[in-house]
Amino acid sequence: MDRSFISEITEDLNNKEVLVKGWVSDIRTLGKVLFIILRDKTDSIQCVAHKDSLKEEIFNKIPKISQESVIEIEGKVKASKQAKKGFEIVVENLKVLAESMTPLPIDTSEKSKTMIDKRLDFRFLDLRRPKIASIFKIRSKVFNFVSNF
């Protein structure tokens, strides 16, 4: 199965298998259901892991995955009214590709402020924040437009 970028996943892929890779933004537990917010360079998506439909070994490993770790998820796209995008990925298989250091030196979730000197020291993490990344995407498009003019 070929990898899909998150921005390529649409409602048209409902009930279709997809393979996505990205950084873990957040993991929430709600009883026998785990929600993973997965982010790649294009967008983010909610992934759902049900205890009943997943190997116990994989399900028990998910809450231990640290923020900003890189994972690979295979699953089916399902329509969902609760998901921000109107659909989510139901996890069928999960593989941790790279564990992140814990605790992270800076908060990438934008829930708290980090001093500029610390952000510059860990610029590689700071650039993963959607707000900062969008600045560089806009800047790139402007430079590209000017150079093509």
Q: Predicted segments — roles?
A:
Residues M1-F149:
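Class II aminoacyl-tRNA synthetase catalytic cores and aaRS-like
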